[in-house]
């Protein structure tokens, strides 16, 4: 899945035109303060390019959180983003209190030249995702005629459409696939993301190592299976390693994560690895806890000793870190998706931090290192390594689906060239 046959912003004529742009401003917030502005910064090049190329206006639309189709301005308003964007662009940003309807259409019909307008959260309308919940929390589906009206209103806000929301590219939502304008182009962030993943997956440097962490095997089956066709080596860490170790080594895992559904496929995945000559590295030792708590009592365990009843593994131990470091040292290209421990808690962060240090070291010797978004991107922000690896993806789910070999609807919907 690459952008090679899709229209991109650098080939789109925006002079004198109103540009309606889908961006991903779904940023983490605490008490209405933005805690990480990576996604806002990532959209700035596309916005600036439009303004510098003489666009009449740039109308920005995004979601934030999961309001499920119910307006929740106190909790999920994009207003703080408008303030942040103003300081990043160094120019005024007009914030509108809705994203569709006559008032919004009027404000966007003939704005002053060079205007930047940010619409309120798309997901305050159930028609964006097509489904949501009502005020009492019951599931509701959007009516087809209302979805059509919602999409028609968004389509009136610009003359050309740009999609720079890689983080939502795996969702067939109204703002991603339903804006009906003659020219639909991918923005610079979309282009950068897809180029990185296309090169990584279609013509990788070798040896190619995948580091896969996270909790559930079942969620990652497609990922593991697809990557086994592409890589030379794979580290399987994090919570899902326990399912592998219990099945393969009959290891006692205490109350560590065990994925019943995923456990049935472990042997198939291992025989595929064997057939493809992929070297698999699993953890050999662990930092354990007597409960799932930041301040739990901690202990140590190995695969051989097992984890005692009532205890759980929440991080890998020093011997595992050594094995991981050896695999990283052999690699010329690394794709990393999912942490190898509960990195949010200091007592269980050491394994992921040690691995991050090795990946940074590998990058400095010329290895191509790609961090799939989500939790692993959060690790980069936490340890300040965003500019010490080759690429940190802004899309967790979207990068995961690319690595699984899927077509992204948001990219599919762009104009072909």
UniProtKB/Swiss-Prot annotation:
UniProt entry tagged with the keyword Nucleotide-binding: yes
Sequence positions that bind (2R)-3-phosphoglycerate: 23-26, 38-39, 62-63, 65-66, 122-123, 170-171
Modified residues (N6-malonyllysine): 131
Binding-site list for ATP: 215, 220, 239, 313, 344, 375-376
Residue numbers carrying N6-(2-hydroxyisobutyryl)lysine: 97, 216, 220, 323
The enzyme's E.C. designation: 2.7.11.1, 2.7.2.3
One BP term from GO: epithelial cell differentiation
Start and end residues of each stretch annotated as Mitochondrial targeting region exposed following cis-trans isomerization by PIN1 and recognized by the TOM complex for mitochondrial translocation of the protein: 38-43
Chief subcellular location: cytoplasm
Residue numbers bearing the Phosphotyrosine modification: 76, 196
GO molecular function: ADP binding; ATP binding; metal ion binding; phosphoglycerate kinase activity; protein serine kinase activity; protein serine/threonine kinase activity; protein-disulfide reductase [NAD(P)H] activity; transmembrane transporter binding
Keywords, ordered alphabetically: Acetylation, ATP-binding, Cytoplasm, Glycolysis, Hydroxylation, Kinase, Magnesium, Metal-binding, Mitochondrion, Nucleotide-binding, Phosphoprotein, Transferase
Known function: Catalyzes one of the two ATP producing reactions in the glycolytic pathway via the reversible conversion of 1,3-diphosphoglycerate to 3-phosphoglycerate. Both L- and D- forms of purine and pyrimidine nucleotides can be used as substrates, but the activity is much lower on pyrimidines. In addition to its role as a glycolytic enzyme, it seems that PGK-1 acts as a polymerase alpha cofactor protein (primer recognition protein).
Protein's name according to its UniProt entry: Phosphoglycerate kinase 1
Organism the protein comes from: Bos taurus (Bovine)
């Amino acid at each position: 899945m690459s952008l090679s046959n899709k229209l991109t912003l650098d080939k789109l004529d925006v002079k004198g035109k109103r540009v309606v742009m889908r961006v991903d401003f779904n940023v983490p917030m605490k008490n209405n303060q933005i805690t990480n502005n990576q996604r806002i910064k990532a959209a700035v090049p596309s916005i600036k390019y439009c303004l510098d190329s003489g666009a009449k206006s740039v109308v920005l639309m995004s979601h934030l959180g999961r309001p499920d189709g119910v307006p929740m301005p106190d909790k999920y308003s994009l207003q703080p983003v408008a303030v942040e964007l103003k300081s990043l662009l160094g120019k005024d940003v007009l914030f509108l209190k809705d994203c569709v309807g006559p008032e919004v259409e009027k404000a966007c019909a003939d704005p002053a030249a060079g205007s930047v307008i940010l619409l309120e959260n798309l997901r305050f309308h159930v028609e964006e995702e097509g489904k949501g919940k009502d005020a009492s929390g019951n599931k509701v589906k959007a009516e087809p005629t209302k979805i059509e009206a919602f999409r028609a209103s968004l389509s009136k806000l610009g003359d050309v459409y740009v999609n720079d929301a890689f983080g939502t590219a795996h969702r067939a939502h109204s703002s991603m696939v339903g804006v009906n304008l003659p020219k639909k182009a991918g923005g610079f962030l979309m282009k950068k993301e897809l180029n990185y993943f296309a090169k990584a997956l279609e013509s990788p440097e070798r040896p190619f190592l995948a580091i896969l962490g996270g909790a559930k095997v079942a969620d990652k089956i497609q990922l593991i299976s697809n990557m086994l066709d592409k890589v030379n080596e794979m580290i399987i860490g994090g919570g899902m390693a326990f399912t592998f170790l219990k099945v393969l080594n009959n290891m006692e895992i205490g109350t560590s994560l065990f994925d019943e559904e995923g456990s049935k496929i472990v042997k198939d995945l291992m025989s595929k690895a064997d057939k493809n000559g992929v070297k698999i590295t699993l953890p050999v030792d662990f930092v354990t806890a007597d409960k799932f708590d930041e301040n739990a009592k901690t202990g140590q365990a190995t695969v051989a000793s097992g984890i005692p009843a009532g205890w759980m593994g929440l991080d890998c131990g020093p011997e595992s870190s050594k094995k991981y470091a050896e695999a990283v040292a052999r690699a010329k290209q690394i794709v990393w998706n999912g942490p190898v421990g509960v990195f949010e808690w200091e007592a269980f962060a050491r394994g992921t931090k040690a691995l991050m240090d090795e990946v940074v070291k590998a990058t400095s010797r010329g290895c191509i290192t790609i961090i799939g978004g989500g939790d692993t991107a959060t690790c980069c922000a936490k340890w300040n390594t965003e500019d010490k690896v080759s690429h940190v993806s802004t899309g967790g789910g979207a990068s995961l689906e690319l690595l699984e070999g899927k077509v992204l609807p948001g990219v599919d919907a762009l104009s072909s060239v």
